[in-house]
Design a protein with these regions (language model features):
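Long, contiguous binding/interaction regions
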Residues: 2-4, 8-41, 58-79
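Amphipathic alpha-helical segments that form the core helices of the histone-fold
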Residues: 42-47
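Helix N-cap motif at beta-to-alpha junctions
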Residues: 48-52
Length: 79
């Protein structure tokens, strides 16, 4: 099974990287972009057959290592 994980800063946290990219895009002429937030994306190959077990493992990985629960939120899909 494959997990696809997206981690982003919480909406209440300032995103300086996203702001920098947004300003750069405006400089390049992309004036129609309202806002931009950056984040991280991970693909994780799992050697499990049970979908519920895969969800449990990926959720645990996100909580323990990939995401900072104070500043970030995450979501994932299992394929």
């Amino acid at each position: 099974m494959k997990a696809k994980v997206i981690i982003k800063l919480k909406d209440t946290i300032l995103d300086p990287q996203g702001l920098t990219i947004h300003h750069a895009l405006e400089t390049l002429g992309y004036k129609n972009i309202e806002s931009l937030r950056s984040g991280k994306f991970f693909e994780i190959e799992l050697n499990v057959e049970d979908r519920e077990k895969a969800v449990e493992i990926v959720d645990e990985i996100c909580k323990k290592l990939l995401a900072n629960p104070v500043t970030e939120e995450y979501q994932f899909t299992i394929e």
